[in-house]
Amino acid sequence: MIKRDGCNISLWQESVDEYLPTNQIDFNKIYDVVIVGGGITGVSTAYHLQKAGMNCLLLEAHELCFGTTGGTTAHINTLLDVPYSTIEKKFSKEKSKLVAESVKEAVNIIRDTVYMYNIDCGFKTTTATLFAETDKQKDELDKISAATTDAGIKNNFINKISIPIKFQKQCR
């Protein structure tokens, strides 16, 4: 069985002070929105809704931004777990483009938020590399690259990668 992200301990989790809530729930207050789950999705949703003027109540059973969010490598990129070739095949080229546009906008929002609030989180822009180890994976990488381009995300095939491992084909 594959371990879920929340089962892993991230590099940064051991060095972060425990978050203790500063506010208690005001049971007499009427909230516009109740958000269940204090991972990156819940916290981001609360942040954006509050910026829009809504009163939000964020509920988390354990610790904010731990669990699945805490166990990730925190890489943010435009290449999703489900490749654009799959999105295109199951839905359409138009839907694949819409997903790519949404993902690019999400990356921009994250980057802008980091810079706006001067968040010291090691954020940097870098490239991602997909690689193929077998002939079957090479064929799949061709499809992924073409669909990624069709979706509006630039990528290209390269001959070398920054780690000393030989692969049959790479795409960046």
PLM-predicted stretches and their roles:
Residues 1-33, 51:
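Extreme N-terminal leader/targeting segments of oxidoreductases
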Residues 2-14, 82-88, 112-172:
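Flavin (FAD/FMN) cofactor-binding and adjacent substrate-gating region
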Residues 29-58:
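N-terminal Rossmann-like FAD-binding beta1-loop-alpha1 element of flavoenzymes
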Residues 72-102:
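Glycine-rich active-site loop/strand segments that organize a redox cofactor
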Residues 94-112, 143:
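A non-catalytic, amphipathic alpha-helix used as a structural packing/dimerization or gating element
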